[in-house]
């Protein structure tokens, strides 16, 4: 029989699983639409551009260690307030439930929440904000140095109970920098630390200790262009910033017979966000290219214009390409695009329908195949 003792991997898997059903739970709006610090509902007004998480408390500049080269945030409160997003998820779940068998698949977000509560005995709507970070090396991201900081409404006992629910033994406790660390028995691989009431970090021991040092003011946090680009992203559902490794973006990778973006190799940092205004969903990507920022903007605008004029580009796609905005500010070039909310919902529902159709065809072909 396989052992069910805790390992760092099992802890990380439990944390990831929790984040998954928590994200779904946030869409249900069960906690009644929380507001930001100024009393304005988050995710429903025109973005301020002051940076993501202004409604929450996770600031990478005071939490994420300087060794990290990539940061990704998820603002669950923005999702919580987004009725349109919830409509799309309900449509998808409803269609998937029709495809499923046995009546065990949730019909909508609310029923998914109830199933999650029964399974984990933890309220998914208690997750407010998540911040994932990792080191970036020349070969790409380094999963050995990665962590997740969570801002929640859960008590320490509630979260520990969830993490221990699949194990045969209790997590062990230790202390570092005045903070409690929970880890697998007889393991030095890592675990989870309590940073403050409702705030936790999951990761390897080195990462946990670095986060505690930064939180206590005893360690260096991310700074410079990486931190600036992140803080300049538009408030929204998700945001990211990352170092771009040398040779990760090359002219050859972004060239065709008709289009060449020569300055793409000058990009050293990238950031972006997915956000919502009163009438549209939007995406933006910013690229720090130093003195080549203006050249990069020119290259991108030329490439977009050429793409819109290609013979195999439909009129609908050409119109959307033309709506992409390209701006340069100092050493940073930003691309952004916004789409009407109802159009986005229509596309999402159409995609769900196509996906269900593919699943049905696959199921039918599998059921009639003989060996």
Model-derived regions, located:
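Terminal disorder- and signal-encoded targeting elements
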Residues: 1-371
């Amino acid at each position: 029989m396989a052992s069910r003792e805790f390992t760092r991997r099992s802890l990380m898997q439990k944390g990831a699983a929790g984040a998954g059903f928590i994200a779904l739970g946030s869409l249900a709006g069960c906690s009644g639409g929380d507001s930001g610090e100024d009393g304005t509902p988050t995710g429903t007004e025109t973005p301020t551009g002051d940076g993501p998480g202004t409604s929450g408390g996770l600031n990478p500049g005071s939490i994420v260690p300087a060794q990290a080269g990539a940061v990704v945030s998820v603002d669950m409160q923005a999702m919580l307030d987004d009725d349109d997003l919830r409509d799309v998820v309900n449509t998808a779940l409803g269609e998937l439930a029709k495809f499923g068998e046995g009546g065990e698949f949730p019909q909508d977000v609310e029923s998914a929440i109830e199933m999650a509560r029964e399974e984990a005995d933890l309220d998914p709507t208690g997750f407010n904000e998540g911040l994932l970070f990792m080191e970036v090396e020349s070969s790409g991201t380094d999963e050995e140095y990665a962590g997740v900081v969570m801002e929640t409404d859960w008590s320490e006992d509630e979260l520990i109970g969830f993490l221990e629910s699949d194990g045969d033994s209790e997590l062990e406790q230790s202390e570092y920098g005045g903070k409690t660390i929970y880890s697998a028995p007889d393991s030095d691989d890592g675990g989870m630390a309590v940073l403050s009431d409702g705030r936790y970090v999951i990761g390897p021991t080195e990462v946990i200790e670095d986060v505690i040092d930064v939180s206590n003011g005893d360690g260096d946090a991310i700074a410079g262009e990486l931190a600036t680009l992140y803080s300049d992203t538009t408030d929204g559902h998700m945001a990211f910033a990352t170092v771009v490794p040398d040779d990760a973006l090359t002219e050859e990778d972004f060239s065709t017979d008709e289009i060449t973006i020569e300055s793409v190799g000058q990009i050293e940092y990238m950031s972006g966000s997915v956000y919502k205004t009163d009438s549209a969903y939007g995406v933006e990507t910013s690229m720090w290219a130093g003195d080549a920022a203006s050249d990069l903007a020119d290259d991108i605008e030329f490439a977009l214009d050429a793409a819109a004029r290609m013979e195999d580009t439909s009129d609908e796609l050409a119109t959307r390409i033309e709506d992409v905005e390209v701006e340069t500010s100092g050493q940073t070039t930003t691309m952004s695009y916004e789409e009407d909310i109802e159009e986005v919902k229509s596309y999402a529902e159409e995609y769900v329908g196509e996906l269900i159709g593919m699943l049905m065809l696959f199921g039918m072909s599998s059921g009639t195949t003989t060996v």
